């Protein structure tokens, strides 16, 4: 058995799980998420837990077993607690402005400001001119939006200027030697 896949997914009170064939829908206080489970894997509802089962020990089944369990667990955590990814902006004149909960305006050293709109289910929390948070219930979507914001101006290795994840260490390079 997959070490991760065989662990049951705890379903806290206030979270409703519906299994319709291969479709698992999780409804909680923060919203609703659903996922279609890959072919050989099945999800069974128990007493306050969800069990992810696989029919055989094929290589693909083993891989999908742990993956499916993690995706279902991420949905349960998302609808109860939600996810947040924090970003920092480093550089002279680099800053972010909030234009509402789903729109940001960045000044990142280009000749024009960059407007960034959040997809549905994502909100932004601007904690200062150089700090922001991306929040939502879908872990994959939160990470993707944070990566897209970071891509607007990746941290460069000489001065470290750009958008980075909070706590991210940028590998620095030594500049060219002067005369």
Swiss-Prot record:
This is Large ribosomal subunit protein uL6. PANTHER family: 60S/50S RIBOSOMAL PROTEIN L6/L9 (PTHR11655), LARGE RIBOSOMAL SUBUNIT PROTEIN UL6M (PTHR11655:SF14). It comes from the Bacteria. One of its GO terms (molecular function) is rRNA binding. Part of the 50S ribosomal subunit. GO terms for cellular component: cytosolic large ribosomal subunit. One of its GO terms (biological process) is cytoplasmic translation. The gene is rplF. This protein binds to the 23S rRNA, and is important in its secondary structure. It is located near the subunit interface in the base of the L7/L12 stalk, and near the tRNA binding site of the peptidyltransferase center. Keywords: Ribonucleoprotein, Ribosomal protein, RNA-binding, rRNA-binding. Pfam families: Ribosomal_L6. Belongs to the universal ribosomal protein uL6 family.
């Amino acid at each position: 058995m997959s070490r991760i896949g065989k662990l049951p997914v705890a379903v806290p009170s206030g979270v409703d799980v519906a299994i319709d064939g291969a479709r698992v829908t999780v409804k909680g206080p923060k919203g609703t998420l659903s996922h279609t489970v890959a072919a050989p894997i099945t999800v069974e509802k128990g007493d306050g837990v969800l069990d992810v089962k696989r029919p055989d020990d094929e290589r693909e089944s083993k891989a999908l077993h742990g993956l499916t369990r993690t995706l279902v667990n991420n949905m349960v955590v998302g609808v109860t607690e939600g996810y947040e990814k924090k970003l920092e902006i480093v550089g002279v004149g680099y800053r972010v402005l909030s234009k509402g909960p789903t729109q940001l305006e960045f000044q990142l050293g280009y000749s024009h400001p960059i407007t960034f709109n959040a997809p549905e289910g994502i909100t932004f929390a601007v904690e200062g001119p150089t700090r922001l948070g991306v929040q939502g219930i879908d872990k994959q979507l939160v990470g993707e939006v944070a990566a897209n914001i970071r891509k607007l101006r990746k941290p460069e290795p000489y001065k470290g200027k750009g958008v980075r994840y909070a706590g991210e260490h940028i590998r620095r390079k030594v500049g060219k030697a002067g005369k």
